[in-house]
Structure formats: C-alpha cells, structure tokens
Amino acid sequence: MKKLLRVTVLAWAMLPLPLLAQSKAPDYAPLTRPITVDQVPGKDIFYSIGSPGIPGKENEGNTSNAGYAVTSEGVVVFDALGTPSLGWALLQDIRKRTDKDIRYIVASHYHADHIYGLQAFRDHSRAVIIAQDHSGDYSENKETADERAEVRLEQRREALAPWVDEHTRVIPPDITFADKITITLGGKRFSLISAGPAHSSSDIMMMVEPDGVLFAGDIVQNGRIPFMNSDDVSTTHWLQGLDEVLALNPKYIIPGHGNPSAAAKEAIAFTRDYILYVRKAMSEAVANWVDFDTAYNSTDWSKYKDYPAFESNNRGNAYRIFLELEASQFKK
C-alpha cells in the first residue's frame, strides 16, 4: 500500500501542469442543461446529482452522480460523469470554488456513465486517476471486465451526439488497487474500498473522514432500477457490500444514482429491497424448476414498474439473478 501511494505522488508530480488557466474553453459540445452542484451541509464536499433515467439526448447523458472534496492541499474527485462536456462542467464548478490542484480522481467503476468525463480532467488537469484492479487496462476502445468499451462508445456516439462524438476517448486509470488504500490529504483521510464484484467487477466506495461522508458508487442507487444484466454482477456480493456501507456508519451518503441521505439505512433501502425482491421471486422459480419466462411473467412487478429504468433494466436484471441462483443451486 505504501509503495502504491509513493508511486501516486510521484506520478502526480511528473504530470504536465494544468492547461486550464492558459487555454480557451475546449471543443466539447455545450450543455443546454447545466449541471447543478450542491454542498454537503457544513462540509467542503460537493456533489452533482444526475437525472434518474438512462442516458439519452433528453438528459444529455447526465444520469449519474459525482462529487469532490476540497482540502488545503488539493481536491479529490469521485467519478467524472458521462460525457466530456459534463466532466468539463464539473471541472469548471471546482474552479469556481477553489484554485487548489485537482490531485486525484477516483473512478467508482469503469462504466460509460461515470468515466467519459475523465477526458476533460485528463486534458485540463494533472489529476491521477485511481480505479480498482478489475477495471482492466481499459486501453482506448478495448474490451475490459466491465463492458466492451468499443461497442459502448459507438452506441453512445449515436445516443449522445453531439456530447459524445468521434473525438471522445476512453481514459484508462493511472493506478489501480486490489482491496483498499487510504490517501491522507489536507487533514482529510480518503479510504478507497473495493466493494465488488457487485454492480460491476470493479466497484469502489470512498469514505471521507473526519467528515463521515461516503461516496458509495453504484452499489447504492436511490429510486432508480439498477443495471444488473452483466456477467460481472453478483447480487450475493452486492448485498454484502451494502452491509459494509452500514458498517462504515456514514453520517452522509452520496449514491451512484439518486438522492443523497443523512441516513445510511434509508439510502440503501431501495437497492437492497429491490435485490431481495427479485432474488426471492427467482429463487422460488429455480427451486421449483420453473422456466424463466414463466417466472418473470407471473411475478408482480407493480411495486417497481413506475421507477426510472424499469423498462430497460428489470427483465434483464431478473434473468441475470435467475442464472446466478441457478448456478448456485447446481454447485450444491
């Protein structure tokens, strides 16, 4: 761990000086829906909350949450939003509040809605990007453990034009870690904790002390049907990760999607209840050798059908959990 942190500091020191102060605004497509950044009450910690739906032209790709903490020695950012334009907007908000260097950006996981904004930070700061080992090398447009980068980028170039275009590129992490690292900066302690495989293979949470603020990433999604239809998803580990959130006893929690909360139990309730509901329905089907289509069509989804991303995510989620439970049964 100490070796990694020494490398981090060295890498930060060797990167070129920020271009922001000396360059004009970059050629990122302007947003027509500006981001809104709020402050954690009484703390030098800020966050942006995305729209609850899936990325599209109507929300300009702004569907995820991100935030940052300001210290006397620099800024630590958690996630970078889903387009270079959004990343630039977040960077500009930081510059309005402080002239401190942006030292680190923590990628909660390598999914497009959280990382395309890294391009703006790479182009206009010398921040070191930190991710979990299983994010993969994520070389430009290459396949990784979490999603096929090239396919996703092409899809977003169509769905999110002009904010994602032919100039948009995927920025890999500078440094990765396996389980946990701690960064001490300007009187704050940032604990980066691996929480995967859960929503992805590379989930990270970031606890900021002594403030007691937790950036939870996508293992916590408040009021939005999470995406689970991936080989990387493990709802068993996901539920364990939510237990870890409670064990951290945060005073304030900022989820990967949805509204923040000063009550951890309330913040995780939607995600936990949804996972448990789907698992119960699918486990009964698996135990009784009921095929998936019959199980899905006979399940009462009325509790969740009106939530954002239900139509796009729910059936795939149920199928992924069905397969997970089926595989678990065969291992017995």
Positions of predicted regions on the chain:
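Active-site HxH/HxHxD metal-binding segment of metal-dependent hydrolases
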Residues: 92-173, 182
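Active-site neighborhood of phospho(di)ester-bond hydrolases with catalytic His/Asp-centered motifs
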Residues: 78-80, 103-111, 130-133, 195, ...
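Divalent-metal (often Zn2+) His-rich catalytic cores of metallo-beta-lactamase-fold enzymes
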Residues: 213, 236-290, 294
